[in-house]
Amino acid sequence: TSPHHKLSCGYAIKDLNGDGVDELVLLTDDYMVCAIFSITDGKPILLGNYRTRHSAWIDEKGWIHENGSGGADNSMNAVYKIADGGASIELIAEFGTNGHEWIGDTAYTKYYKLVNGEKVSITESEYFALNEQYTKYLGTHAGAEATKNYSNLTFISLYTEAEIAMEMYEAVLKNEIKV
């Protein structure tokens, strides 16, 4: 990867659930959430880590919204809140798509919601109602934009301005990035 990718790494510190314990959010400068940590008994606790096909965003309540994909036929949307004390996250809702069902020559998407740990079939309209209620911002970049606009997180770069300038300058000299 080129040097400008690592320069976008940073963090934010905020009490996401209002329990008096700050969480550490690792994220990029465009607010793509990479990982969320809390502290319990003086030790860091990883609450979640995320990547391109399994992304997350944080809303104004401090809730964590995950969007994942296991391929074209399967998707998952989940919403969590951080438990008081920060030791874990609690599932508020999970729903998604679970493959297709063929009836004749037509494939129909199968929708589900999680109830007591089990995937329960739901209708398309129920799926879209859950989607509207919990995940209005689908997709990796839309989620990052939602985190930026609604979470009240403040990005802090891992690098100083001088380090960023030097890395960018060296990358230009090596022809790794164009200006």
Q: What is the predicted function of each stretch?
A:
Residues V33-G48, I82:
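Beta-propeller blade repeat segments, especially FG-GAP/WD-type strand-to-loop junctions
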